[in-house]
Amino acid sequence: MEGRPHPAGRRDDAHQEAQEEEVVLSAGLTLGSVRVDTPVVLAPMAGITNAAYRRLCLEQATAQGGTSLFVCEMITSRGLVEGDATTRSMLVFDELEDVRSVQLYGTDPAYVGKATEILCADYGVAHVDLNFGCPVPKVTRKGGGAALPWKRSLLGEILQAAVTAAGRYDVPVTMKTRMGIDPEHLTYLDAGRIAEESGVAAIALHGRTAIQGYSGAADWDSIARLVEHVSIPVLGNGDIWEAADALRMVEQTGAAGVVVGRGCLGRPWLFRDLAAAFAGSAIATLPTLGEVRTMMHRHAELLCRHMGEERGCKEFRKHVSWYLKGFAAGGELRNSLALVSTMAELDALLAELEPDEPFPTSILGAPRGRQGSPRKRVVLPEGWLEDTDGRGVVVREDANETTGG
């Protein structure tokens, strides 16, 4: 995708300064035995970061001469160990993925350790990330996700189990977490300390609490505080909508890199911009609608290649609104695109889009994906907050549970 070069920083002075400073901000990112040229990680997102989407983002990054880390959808340790078919079906990798990266979720150290062993031994995974950031009630009510770091001892046991299992294969383990449960129950500094003591290669921090969900603004100051608190690399996450945001986060916080989630929805070319930005080039890809429809075709094509045409087209439907955000495509056409069942049908509908329509620059920097409102409370196991050292009442995760944080 060529797109049109654009100084993405025109929205405000901070963005403009970040884009205009044409300096190399990073020499890449090293996580144990894994190294990438661009210090950027694609966050695992349920139903999004399958092999097809990871391949699409990888193509964009490499087109700009960069390499990033693209993480598979989150899977559960119990599902993997017990041979759950849905879990196993998610562990599909594209032929171009030199570094196989998977996010693992679990609340039982034994299961997490065994699942890590399976990933390394049976699937050739080169990087394992552990999820301690998911804020959704179905996870936190079991003591998992963003709730688990409150139990410091349990967190340490899980991390050590994964690091020990992965260490036999020289595979680095990282963790992703949030600031805490709510402002009164913060966990991220202790989590960073425990991660470092456990031999974790890096910690990614989403600058929101569980009670915030995806609402409000991410607190980048918390990322800076964590950077000062630990000696292992810290990756910043939250409110990275443009490449300029990533540069600004690294500059303001001292983070070793960034984790990008919702910002790339319907915009896989963001990884091209990120590769350029961290190499010192002030560019932003502004594709015409014709170029966007080419990207949409490529995305659907990859989905069909990995899943078959019927399922691939169904999986593509959710992406239509993200790709067309801000463009003038009519509601009837959008609706039809969101119901496609074959590639031929998709191509016929894409042909109806006006190819010369310019990119809607008004949406640059705007949030994408789910946002919502803060939760009234975080659902936790009974008595969860009574102590920080005991296990409390951890409820075992469902074998086929999938979500993200």
Regions found by a protein language model. Give the residues of each.
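N-terminal small/glycine-rich loop or linker at the start of catalytic domains
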Residues: G32-V41, R78-V99, C134-G144, G167-M179
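Glycine-rich, positively charged N-terminal anion/phosphate-binding segment
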Residues: E20-T30, M45-D122
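Hydrophobic faces of well-ordered beta-strands that scaffold small-molecule active sites
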Residues: V40-P44, F70-C72, R100-L104, V128, ...
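Active-site mouth loops of central-metabolism enzymes
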Residues: P39-T49, V99-V112, P149, M175-Y188
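Alpha/beta enzyme core
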Residues: E59-G65, G113-G144, L148, R152-I232
